[in-house]
Amino acid sequence: MKAEFVRILPHMFNLFLAVFPEIFIINATFILLIHGVVFSTSKKYDYPPLASNVGWLGLLSVLITLLLLAAGAPLLTIAHLFWNNLFRRDNFTYFCQIFLLLSTAGTISMCFDFFDQERFDAFEFIVLILLSTCGMLFMISAYDLIAMYLAIELQSLCFYVIAASKRKSEFSTEAGLKYLILGAFSSGILLFPCSMIYGSTGATHFDQLAKILTGYEITGARSSGIFMGILFIAVGFLFKITAVPFHMWAPDIYEGSPTPVTAFLSIAPKISIFANILRVFIYGSYGATLQQIFFFCSIASMILGALAAMAQTKVKRLLAYSSIGHVGYICIGFSCGTIEGIQSLLIGIFIYALMTMDAFAIVLALRQTRVKYIADLGALAKTNPILAITFSITMFSYAGIPPLAGFCSKFYLFFAALGCGAYFLALVGVVTSVIGCFYYIRLVKRMFFDTPRTWILYEPMDRNKSLLLAMTSFFITLFLLYPSPLFSVTHQMALSLYL
């Protein structure tokens, strides 16, 4: 007995190290919650506002989690299954979680100036961001339908609350309520097919489902329960990533939510959900059907995103439709059904996340003057030329103009589409990119050539957003000079899905 325990001890220790980042961030989240509750209600300390204090501690917790995740990297030479095989840790999980944590850290660093300007003292905001990050970390590593659904619900419940966190704003309350109702509907769409698949196969584990679906593929048999289950899971995922025709909720919720929440909703859930889509749909005999669904949604998202954004007059609604369009471009990678398509999808997600973080950091920097409409950006080049140049670089990258990172992302996605024979998909992507140039360049024209109705003196940005903008702009501008690291990482991630 003792010898057996000594033999398995190194394996248990490795598994503990593999899951330790999630354990740490969960404990840190609850410690911050207790810290906030105790001190914010303390008469001794005169009921201090703790949003910024908890924000800094939350940022530190995310960075420590990032270091713990990096420390476990040498253990990922092979895939590890843990917690009764509910979760899987491999290179794909590792890199997706690292990028998710970087996105969370970037979002939190954008919040501090917002707390001061809005006199926002609800420390629960940061706690909910950390808790939703826990859910997304588990979602990325989920290897079972039950674990997947519970992780999605954990992150979704936090999103419903933070969307309505600006209590004095009717728009924020409306956004949170809409998100709650429609999110509950999409969660039902996800839960129902999971039960259908379990009823048809008696399995919820992805490995077991892969073997069953491979058996169907070999024998040529079909199961209506499995087919409908996979179809409804795809619909639930498409709703979560705001792909057309399941996008209706996104513009209103993105506009009504506080700007840091909009930034978080635009970036973090897409990383985790696309990662989970790849986990769920990488196996099975229904790949051709799923490719057709993503093919249609990709085309519809690109067209609607490009055309609807042209009619927008508000900055956040324009960015919402831009996000829908970029989801269409990213879905090209899944529509290909090849390893090159998956790699291009991962490159597209990472570059989109950096561009979106950059754009929302600028929108938050302009919030000091309550910039809401595109017309409010008039003559920004004269009042704050550095910010105008940075915003212009981001818009050109969104439009896919070389030599910026956005061009490389779209080029690789279109190249993957051409490689698998999806010529029409690539053609629609190129045409919608050209149409999209109109509304992106219109913003640049407003900043450099239009005269505002009233002149505004912009205050300098705080250090956190300045540092964030510097790093993201540096990557967007100089990515094409040395793209090999990202290509190498995404290739490893794509390969690890098949191992």
From Swiss-Prot:
InterPro entries: NADH-Q_OxRdtase_suN/2, ND/Mrp_TM. The chain crosses the membrane at residues 15-35, 56-76, 95-115, 122-142, 145-165, 179-199, 226-246, 263-283, 293-313, 319-339, 345-365, 386-406, 411-431, 467-487. Coiled coil: none annotated. It is found in: Mitochondrion inner membrane. It is a multi-pass membrane protein. GO terms for cellular component: mitochondrial inner membrane; plastid. It holds the Pfam family Proton_antipo_M. It catalyses: a ubiquinone + NADH + 5 H(+)(in) = a ubiquinol + NAD(+) + 4 H(+)(out). GO terms for molecular function: NADH dehydrogenase (ubiquinone) activity. GO terms for biological process: ATP synthesis coupled electron transport. Its EC number is 7.1.1.2. Keywords: Electron transport, Membrane, Mitochondrion, Mitochondrion inner membrane, NAD, Respiratory chain, Translocase, Transmembrane, Transmembrane helix, Transport, Ubiquinone. Exons a and b (AtMg00285) and c, d and e (AtMg01320) are cis-spliced, while a trans-splicing reaction is required to link exons b and c. A stretch of 270 kb of the mitochondrial genome is duplicated within the centromere of chromosome 2 resulting in the duplication of the gene. The expression of this duplicated gene (At2g07733 and At2g07689) is not demonstrated. It is also probably not RNA edited and therefore differs in all the positions known to be edited. Complex I is composed of at least 49 different subunits. Core subunit of the mitochondrial membrane respiratory chain NADH dehydrogenase (Complex I) that is believed to belong to the minimal assembly required for catalysis. Complex I functions in the transfer of electrons from NADH to the respiratory chain. The immediate electron acceptor for the enzyme is believed to be ubiquinone. This is NADH-ubiquinone oxidoreductase chain 2. It comes from Arabidopsis thaliana (Mouse-ear cress).
